[in-house]
From Swiss-Prot:
It is an enzyme of class 1 (oxidoreductase). It catalyses: 2 superoxide + 2 H(+) = H2O2 + O2. The gene is sodB. It comes from Synechococcus elongatus (strain ATCC 33912 / PCC 7942 / FACHB-805) (Anacystis nidulans R2). This is Superoxide dismutase [Fe]. The keyword DNA damage does not apply. The lineage of its organism: Bacteria, Bacillati, Cyanobacteriota, Cyanophyceae, Synechococcales. It comes from the Bacteria.
Length: 201
């Protein structure tokens, strides 16, 4: 059973002008598709074939002999999570239980935004910044290249992709502008809230 490239949860033009159709076509149809294809080819006919991709990632994390499989599995999963972390008319702030938890663990939503932006901006090279639940506490973490919180026992709630292919066509070297736009215009707090609710259920 192969892992299928998920369709975008919005139209290719839905995030413009913040993320353009051209960026989404390259990012989803080329980059993400390549990770999915590489993963399916690498896992085929192994004893992990047919396992959910999350289980494969957790099983092989830290195994240097399976680094290629891990990188493609994690990147396939990370991207699927990222597409749900953004939406048209996103941004703003969460409400309800997640809003209360952010205020409790970060002091305020404004503190969270500052820390999240800093983590995303200071990820050296390619990678990701995440809002995660870790042993009952909300934390911001960043992962390099293909690494993912699910390999470290954390529950991701929201992510931003800071690989250059996520923003370079639209923002060139202005990663901080892309990060600010994500926070203010794109972040899908409904998705993050649903992930939080599931994690504490």
């Amino acid at each position: 059973m192969s892992y299928e490239l998920p369709a975008l949860p919005f139209d290719y033009t839905a995030l413009a002008p913040y993320i353009t159709k051209e960026t989404l076509e390259f990012h989803h149809d080329k980059h993400h598709a390549a990770y999915v294809n590489n993963y399916n080819n690498a896992v085929k006919d192994t004893d992990l074939d047919g396992q959910p991709i999350e289980a494969v990632i957790k099983a092989i994390a830290g195994d240097a002999s399976k680094a290629g499989l891990f990188n493609n599995a994690a990147q396939a999963w990370n991207h699927s999570f990222y597409w749900n972390s953004i939406k048209p008319n996103g941004g703003g702030a969460p409400t309800g239980a997640l809003a209360d938890k952010i205020a409790a663990d970060f002091g305020s939503f404004e503190n969270f935004v500052t820390e999240f932006k800093q983590a995303a901006a200071t990820q050296f090279g390619s990678g990701w910044a995440w809002l995660v639940l870790d042993n009952g506490t909300l934390k911001i973490t960043k992962t390099g290249n293909a690494d993912t919180p699910i390999a470290h026992g954390q529950t991701p709630l929201l992510t931003i992709d800071v690989w250059e292919h996520a923003y370079y066509l639209d923002y060139q070297n202005r990663r901080p502008d892309y990060i600010s736009t994500f926070v203010e215009k794109l972040a899908n707090w409904d998705f993050a809230s649903a992930n939080y609710a599931a994690a504490i259920a």
